[in-house]
């Protein structure tokens, strides 16, 4: 019944809150507590319910709508199985936790990492992106054939990770007092990018003119790098190049993209290649690393390359 389910939710959110705060390892400026308030035990497609609240304000006195569905018993649910965070009407965030089975009820509360998964989705609610989307597989990297693994974080993998990265902590602290960050921090993700990236190149300790710089972009979902550089630059007589308009390089980048598909219309990581007399050096520029400048009150991210 409803009372028993509310009790189950209360116990579960005790887990979520305990994990959320402990994973901050003393770096949060606030104590965070999510309090479940059971509204309805529904008997319809959870996908249909989700679509209703994408268009209807629904819960003006609440901050997040959590929809739990333990079986894919409606045809429209299978295309949206799994756990994710999305937006609803009036800037309400919705967290959907939907089973992956069409035949058996999945006891989501019985999954030992479910509370960490919900914490991950609530991380999106607070404004943190998926760090795992910055991952590059070596086999999908035609530029230097090296794997890139993002920082350890609940927003990278919640299965076996028990901490927030410094990037996530900064964002969660920054948006902490907002009940609806989508409303109060509109466009925040793009605003975190610095305006510039300053690249400085030295050869044997001396500033080097004419070093070719290639900026190769990576895509979410594919975990790959596009071999054709998105942008190409060259250092000046000071051995420097100032890359400007950085927010628009990463987010909603202008063509040519040299790819037919760019998920979320964003480059998630850039690999900067510097070439001098046939020798090449590489620097990873994932969005979350470059955005750290926002919390340092700087408008330029510094890159130094030594040959």
Residue ranges and their predicted role:
Residues 1-114, 219-306:
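Propeptide-to-catalytic entry region of secreted or membrane-anchored zinc metalloproteases
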Residues 16, 20-24, 126-130, 159, ...:
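Sec/Tat-exported extracytoplasmic proteins
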Residues 195-203:
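A short, amphipathic beta-strand motif
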């Amino acid at each position: 019944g409803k009372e028993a389910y509310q009790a189950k939710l209360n116990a579960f959110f005790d887990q979520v809150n305990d994990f959320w705060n402990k994973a901050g390892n003393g770096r949060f400026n606030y104590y965070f507590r999510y309090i479940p308030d059971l509204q309805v035990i529904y008997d319809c497609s959870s996908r249909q319910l989700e679509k209703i609240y994408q268009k209807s304000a629904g819960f003006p006195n609440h901050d997040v709508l959590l929809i739990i569905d333990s079986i894919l018993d409606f045809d429209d649910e299978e295309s949206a199985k799994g756990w994710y965070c999305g937006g609803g009407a009036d800037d309400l965030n919705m967290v959907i936790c939907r089973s992956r089975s069409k035949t058996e009820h999945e006891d989501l509360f019985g999954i030992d990492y479910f509370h960490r998964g919900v914490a991950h989705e609530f991380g999106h609610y607070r404004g943190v992106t998926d760090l795992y989307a910055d991952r590059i597989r070596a086999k999908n990297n035609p530029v230097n054939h090296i794997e890139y693994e993002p920082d350890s974080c609940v927003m990278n993998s919640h299965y076996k990770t028990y901490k927030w990265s410094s990037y996530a902590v900064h964002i969660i602290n920054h948006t902490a007092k907002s009940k609806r960050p989508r409303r109060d921090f509109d466009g925040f993700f793009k605003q975190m990018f610095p305006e510039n990236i300053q690249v400085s190149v030295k050869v044997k300790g001396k500033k080097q003119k004419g070093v070719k710089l290639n900026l190769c972009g990576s895509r979410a979902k594919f975990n790959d790098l596009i071999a054709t550089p998105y942008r190409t630059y060259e250092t000046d007589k000071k051995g420097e190049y100032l890359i400007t308009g950085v927010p628009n390089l990463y987010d909603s980048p202008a063509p040519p993209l040299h790819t037919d598909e760019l998920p979320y219309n964003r480059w998630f990581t850039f690999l900067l290649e510097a070439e001098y007399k046939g020798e090449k050096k590489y620097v990873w520029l994932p969005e979350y690393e470059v955005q750290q400048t926002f919390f340092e009150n700087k408008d330029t991210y510094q890159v130094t390359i030594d040959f």
